[in-house]
Amino acid sequence: MKNLMKELNIMDKFEFKFLSFELDPNAPKESKINLVESMAKKYHMPVEQSRKSIEYINKLGKAEGLDFRNDTSRLGNTFNAHRLTKYIESKGNYENTEKIINLLYDAYFTKNLLISDEKVLIDLGIQAGCTKEEVEKLLASNEFTKEVRQDEEAGYSEGVHGVPYFIINNEVISGAVPKEEMKEVLLRVLKNEEKKGKDGHPEGVVCDETGCHFKKK
């Protein structure tokens, strides 16, 4: 997303906020099945179809210079990872917030670390500007539970059931959207802002059970 915004020279037109969303809030600390099997089970699809979907996501990542290895990801509960992110965000340093998110992505998608493991979270937290004691104290508490749940409830209310998802000017874009399609969305949002009507409601993207599309004039 940000690479595309830089290409379009529109980074200064948007403000960013990271939101929490767990695909499986009831997941165990470490799952006994891999991502391919998990997706097949969750979305009631053949294992081979699930594998191809993951390969497609890996391909999209590589096109953006990201070394995704989803097929060997270690699944586990991500709640504490979200709490850690919220904690770092609360300290008001955007760079560290972005850093912990990138570290978590790298740990999960590329290094295939178990991000429910407290030792992993402590190490990542330290790299993102926290002390070991800070992270240990956070993990031993219930702090930032409310903040994570509020983000998730907001996502559910918008019809979100998977990741990635983006909310651009209150419009939801779900799924791994191809670059050209995302480019079209971003430029359309900016154009709509410029020609916003008197009622203050721009044209935008509509999402329903069939996917996301632009409103017809």
Language model: regions and residue ranges:
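Structural alpha/beta surface segment adjacent to cysteine/selenocysteine redox centers
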Residues: 2-108, 201, 213-214
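C-terminal cap of thioredoxin/glutaredoxin-like
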Residues: 1-10, 85-217
